[in-house]
Each structure stands twice: as C-alpha cells, then as structure tokens.
Amino acid sequence: MIEQDGRILAIDRKDPVWPGLTFPGGHVEDHESFHDSVVREIKEETNLTIKNPRLVGVKQFYDHEDHRYIVFFYKASEFSGEVKSSEEGKLIWVTKEELMQRKLAYNFDHDLPVFFDENISEHLLDAARDELF
C-alpha cells in the first residue's frame, strides 16, 4: 500500500481472474528477497520507486488444488517518480473512505484490516476459515 497526503494508490486490475480495485503487487522471483520483490513490482506496476517499505502483515490462502500461498503486505510512503498506469490496470489515488465504496477485487475487503489496524497482522483464508489475527 502506497500512501501520500491521506490518499492511497490503488489499481483497478484488468485480470479476468481477479478483477477490481486492489493494491499494486505481484510475485517473488527466484532468489529475490521479499524487499526487492515489492520494490520491483511497485516499479513495474506504478513507475514509482519506493523507499523503506514496511512489512505490516501476511495473508495465507489455498487454491482449488490445495496449494498454499503466502502474501506479504507492505506499506510505503516514501517514493520517487511519477505514477503511470501499466498493462496490469489503471492507477488511481483514493482516500480510505473512497476505497471502501468502490468495487474491490474478490475478498480484498477482508485484507484491508491488516493494512489499517496495527493490532491485526494476519489474514487466513481457506475452504473452512476466513479469519484475522
């Protein structure tokens, strides 16, 4: 999550599997640190170079074949460059309130407490549970 002056940078994803508003991000490449991954993905999707990203929580979920995935949630408020949308989708600056009124990507609303509540650091999602810790 990238923040500036009370606004949050969100991406309206074009992905047919997971369309809707979410935060920029992506996958970790082989032999890449999580830190380097978030810096690279943000650059690829927004054209911004973030500085001092802070890990704020994690999400774990399972796909339809019961493969486990772990997502690392970061926040950053220091960056350089100009915002530029990518093939991933259109970028928009929104307030927290505006974000909550938009069409979000599937289950993304369940991730948001990890970003906004410092007492919550984990989101577990599987066939039987959708819990925050």
PLM segments and residue spans:
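Nudix hydrolase/Nudix homology domain
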Residues: 18-21, 89-133
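Residues in well-ordered beta-strands of folded domains
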Residues: 1, 24, 56, 75, ...
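Structural signal for conserved beta-strand scaffold positions within catalytic alpha/beta enzyme cores
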Residues: 10, 57, 93-95
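Short, solvent-exposed loop/turn elements at beta->coil junctions and helix N-caps
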Residues: 56-62
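Gly/Ser/Thr-rich beta-alpha loop segments that engage phosphate groups in nucleotides
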Residues: 22, 27-28
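N-terminal strand-loop-strand
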Residues: 1-22, 50, 54
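Unchanged
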Residues: 28-51, 62-110
